[in-house]
């Protein structure tokens, strides 16, 4: 057993943290916890254990938020990008771009003479056991997102111009190990969410 020294202020913050869990239980609502750390590099040792214990107590399942672009390999998901995507990360900021989403990265479809549409293939190493949410925006122009699973179109979404964050929900019954997303230039993708309450 390891003990930690903490200030009264830290203890008070943790009490508020766990009080929110109790309130959520009473309201039958959920709490999302975001963890930024080195688990993406070293594996999910400590945060995985904490997540497991919290889920035993409070419920919920799934991987959670997964970056659409990362310099490490996210657990269980890999991507293949067409040549007409630009990649953004807060670790290597580019002047004029500041919309990274929760995973702190984004990709943006750009004009490309080799292809009219940008495409992204998503490969799941294991099928998700809950619905998939794909987070996006199209700040400067209208767009259209087409999503297919093994040659069957499952979603066709008209996207209004605007920087507001939006998401598409793909029901778990329609998810196969390979999904393909196609869009026009200007669309920005921020992340996938594979979680359920």
Protein language model regions, located:
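N-terminal secretory targeting modules
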Residues: 1-36, 40-197
């Amino acid at each position: 057993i390891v003990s930690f020294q903490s200030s009264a202020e830290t203890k008070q913050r943790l009490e508020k943290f766990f009080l929110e869990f109790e309130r959520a239980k009473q309201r039958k609502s959920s709490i999302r916890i975001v963890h930024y750390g080195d688990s993406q590099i070293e594996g999910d040792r400590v945060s995985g254990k904490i997540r497991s214990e919290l889920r035993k107590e409070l419920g919920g399942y799934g991987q959670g938020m997964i970056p659409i672009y990362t310099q490490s390999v996210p657990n269980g998901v890999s991507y293949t990008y067409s040549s007409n995507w630009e990649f953004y990360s807060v670790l290597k900021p580019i002047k004029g771009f500041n919309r990274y989403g929760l995973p702190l990265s984004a990709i943006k479809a750009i004009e490309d003479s080799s292809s009219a549409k940008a495409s992204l293939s998503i490969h799941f190493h294991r099928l998700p056991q809950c619905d998939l949410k794909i987070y996006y925006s199209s700040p400067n122009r209208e767009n259209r997102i087409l999503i297919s699973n093994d040659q069957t179109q499952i979603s066709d979404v008209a996207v209004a111009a605007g920087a507001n964050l939006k998401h598409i929900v793909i029901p778990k019954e329609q998810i196969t190990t390979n999904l393909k997303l196609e869009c026009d230039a200007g669309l920005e993708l921020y992340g996938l969410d594979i979680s359920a309450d």
